[in-house]
């Protein structure tokens, strides 16, 4: 099984003599809503239909409204990774409601890759989709990692 998607960074086009050895198959665009819903169900979410709808809306809006930074990925690979993160958070923090778990996963997983210009837009989108919940959802913190970063920054000046 070989995919021909040279659009991702680091990939190159296959030469024509190698392309001729493979049978071409065409696939349609996947139904991201259905994939999200099923993955959320698989991770134990009861409100999977509603949360999947919010998830897909957010990623589509991010694709349309945020800058076209080359490191942004709002497609299936990023969706699946974020949903796995949400499942882990659900298991680690059973006291949080499902919408807060998904909000935390979306915020914490994506904020680090956003440019400063896109940060406010993204937070606004989250606030629109999860009204009034941002302040109630704790940030995942790694105190040991943060301490090491602070120490290194001080040492380097």
Where are these regions (language model features)?
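Short regulatory helix/loop adjacent to the ATP-binding pocket of P-loop NTPases
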Residues: 7-21
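Alpha-helical lid/collar subdomain of P-loop NTPases
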Residues: 1-4, 20-157
């Amino acid at each position: 099984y070989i995919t021909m998607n040279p659009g991702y960074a680091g990939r190159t086009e296959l030469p024509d003599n190698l392309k001729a050895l493979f049978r071409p198959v065409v696939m349609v665009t996947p139904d991201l809503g259905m994939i999200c819903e099923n993955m959320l169900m698989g991770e134990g979410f009861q409100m999977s239909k509603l949360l999947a709808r919010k998830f897909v809306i957010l990623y589509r809006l991010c694709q349309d409204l945020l800058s076209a930074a080359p490191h942004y990925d709002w497609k299936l690979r990023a969706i699946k990774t974020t949903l796995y993160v949400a499942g882990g958070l659900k298991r680690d923090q059973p006291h949080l409601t499902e919408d807060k778990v998904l909000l935390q996963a979306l915020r914490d997983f994506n904020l680090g890759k956003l440019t400063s210009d896109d940060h406010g837009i993204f937070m606004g989108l989250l606030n629109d989709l999860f009204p009034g919940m941002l302040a109630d959802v704790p940030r995942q913190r790694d105190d040991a990692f943060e301490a090491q970063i602070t120490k290194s920054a001080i040492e380097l000046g």
